[in-house]
């Protein structure tokens, strides 16, 4: 697969029990169900839900959304609660749990953290396959008694976030959260298998300035942009202040103070 060629994908049932579900996802995503020797990725359906596997000898393993076990469960239990930097960035404080629009949801990890801390979170993902992984993960989370109350605070929308924000109807989110993909090649991030999936399927968010502009127009209280720590700010309005971590930075664009309800 070259950088300029669109990746080839096919849908695969991991056993006969999942053949009907595989047909469903193939139709939903507009992907072939038959095996393709030239495919770069397999969209697999099985007991653990929907997952994407990069094919080839150097495959990093399947990628799925799992809010019940693994990294998300560990962070929910031991991640530092409202003392986490992301919590401070969106304005979580005693008596304040803002309504958040996560406009670049990806695999939903940050959105889940915010929902686990009590925020109502709307997630937007523009890439249909990534949105499908997130939809499947949320559906499984809603069936788990421990995680269901958190998943109930998460709502998923598919589509272009900038367009959705410009056409927003109803009560505006208090906070818009952006974590765009950028062309900066951070080697420590690229080794993660999620990045191996995202680069060819999603590409970089070259419309980040337009996303920021739409977010600033919609958010009632603040916009938060997550960036690699040493990366430049997004072109456009300048942040009011930043919170720096070891590898990431949160640029905060305040509009008005978040107060107790």
Curated annotation (Swiss-Prot):
Keywords: Cytoplasm, Methyltransferase, rRNA processing, S-adenosyl-L-methionine, Transferase. InterPro entries: 16SrRNA_methylTrfase_J (IPR007536), SAM-dependent_MTases_sf (IPR029063). S-adenosyl-L-methionine binds at residues 109-110, 125-126, 179. GO terms for molecular function: rRNA (guanine-N2-)-methyltransferase activity. It holds the Pfam family SAM_MT. It catalyses: guanosine(1516) in 16S rRNA + S-adenosyl-L-methionine = N(2)-methylguanosine(1516) in 16S rRNA + S-adenosyl-L-homocysteine + H(+). It is found in: Cytoplasm. One of its GO terms (cellular component) is cytoplasm. The keyword Ion transport does not apply. Its EC number is 2.1.1.242. It is an enzyme of class 2 (transferase). HAMAP family: 16SrRNA_methyltr_J. Specifically methylates the guanosine in position 1516 of 16S rRNA. Belongs to the methyltransferase superfamily. RsmJ family. This is Ribosomal RNA small subunit methyltransferase J. The lineage of its organism: Bacteria, Pseudomonadati, Pseudomonadota, Gammaproteobacteria, Pseudomonadales.
């Amino acid at each position: 697969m070259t950088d300029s060629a669109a990746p080839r994908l096919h849908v695969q049932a991991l056993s006969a029990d999942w053949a009907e579900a595989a047909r469903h996802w193939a139709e939903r995503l507009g992907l072939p169900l038959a095996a393709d020797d030239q495919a770069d990725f397999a969209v697999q359906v099985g007991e653990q839900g929907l997952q994407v596997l990069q094919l080839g000898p150097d495959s990093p393993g399947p990628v799925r959304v799992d809010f019940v076990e693994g990294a998300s469960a560990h962070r929910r239990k031991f991640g530092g609660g409202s003392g986490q930097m992301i919590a401070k960035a969106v304005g979580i404080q005693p008596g304040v749990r803002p309504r958040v629009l996560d406009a670049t949801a990806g695999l939903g990890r940050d959105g889940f953290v915010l929902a686990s801390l009590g925020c109502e979170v709307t997630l937007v993902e523009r890439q249909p396959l990534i949105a499908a992984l997130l939809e499947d993960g949320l559906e499984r989370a809603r069936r788990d008694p421990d995680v269901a109350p958190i998943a109930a605070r998460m709502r998923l929308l598919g589509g272009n976030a900038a367009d959705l924000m410009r056409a927003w109807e109803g009560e505006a989110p208090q906070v818009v959260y952006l974590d765009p993909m950028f062309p900066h090649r951070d080697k420590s991030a690229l080794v993660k298998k999620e990045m191996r999936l995202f680069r060819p399927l999603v590409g970089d968010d070259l419309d980040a300035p337009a996303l920021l502009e739409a977010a600033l127009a919609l958010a009632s209280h603040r916009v938060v942009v997550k960036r690699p720590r040493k990366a430049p700010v997004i072109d456009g309005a300048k942040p009011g202040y930043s919170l720096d971590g070891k590898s990431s930075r949160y640029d905060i664009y305040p509009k008005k103070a978040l107060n107790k309800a």
